[in-house]
């Protein structure tokens, strides 16, 4: 029988993110291929652990998995392969604590990080329908004056702290642990005299304008990647630019994933009699909502496939209309009289509280006899 992602990570279904991440790190460390050379079983276990954390470590993917299982993830077009940020963090965790690196982690000769993150503001309309947007970006480029060394005349010295190794070693009992040298940040070299052009930073800042294609259905805090638009970490080589969406709220529609919510205020007589009202759809059409008699306040009605498209699949959510019953703030004499006649016409049915409350009062009186 196939194990669930929770069983693979050895956590309960109600576990929080901190517990899940802690268990993941523990298991990833235990089954890491660098610690289990030639062990195919450990390698497969390591892959399963990464797959499980890729889903449970992301709240949106976790919610899909909890509701629909793996099948739901596949149908929603959820990718389980892009966890580069976490693996880079995990790689440094392995390297600093145990003296070996995670496979696939980026080993950088340059002090310039290849990738960088930039926020992009989108209107509700731009996010829902997608758009082409020109963004102003500023990236780090290798300083030509010092060839990215950060030193005047490219003159670097061996770090005295680590003797040019980039690592220092610590002993605990019978074990020796390697740590990145703090004096040179693992480079093994230090700057004697800073470059005047970049002030020893190894890079200068350059501005550019980029035409970005925003996919239909992108949501707040979603990220998209622009390949080769990141920092120039080596001469002629650039990393990736990650854009994180900041989507403004709409006055009428509220969004949760691919579902849209809208409140429809209806008068109390409409609820009593039943009625058909027009509801605006996302694409400008009018949808007919048949309100049944005696519908309840906050009762919701769903229009399937009238929501937002998933940015990575053909799936489209629902438009959910929530009724908001409105009562008159005041009545004139004629309205008061009409309501009183209507109320009286129901007879005993118009006073349902009596059967409940009078029985309760009678019971309480019996208690004190």
Swiss-Prot record:
Zn(2+) 1 binds at residues 143, 146, 195, 198. It is found in: Cytoplasm. A zinc finger (CR-type) spans 130-207. Its main location: cytoplasm. Binds 2 Zn(2+) ions per monomer. The keyword Repeat applies. GO terms for molecular function: ATP binding; heat shock protein binding; unfolded protein binding; zinc ion binding. Residues 4-69 form the J domain. The keyword Nucleotidyltransferase does not apply. Homodimer. Participates actively in the response to hyperosmotic and heat shock by preventing the aggregation of stress-denatured proteins and by disaggregating proteins, also in an autonomous, DnaK-independent fashion. Unfolded proteins bind initially to DnaJ; upon interaction with the DnaJ-bound protein, DnaK hydrolyzes its bound ATP, resulting in the formation of a stable complex. GrpE releases ADP from DnaK; ATP binding to DnaK triggers the release of the substrate protein, thus completing the reaction cycle. PANTHER family: CHAPERONE PROTEIN DNAJ, DNAJ HOMOLOG 1, MITOCHONDRIAL-RELATED. NCBIfam families: DnaJ_bact (TIGR02349), PRK10767.1 (NF008035), PRK14288.1 (NF010881). Belongs to the DnaJ family. The J domain is necessary and sufficient to stimulate DnaK ATPase activity. Zinc center 1 plays an important role in the autonomous, DnaK-independent chaperone activity of DnaJ. Zinc center 2 is essential for interaction with DnaK and for DnaJ activity. This is Chaperone protein DnaJ. It comes from Helicobacter pylori (strain J99 / ATCC 700824) (Campylobacter pylori J99).
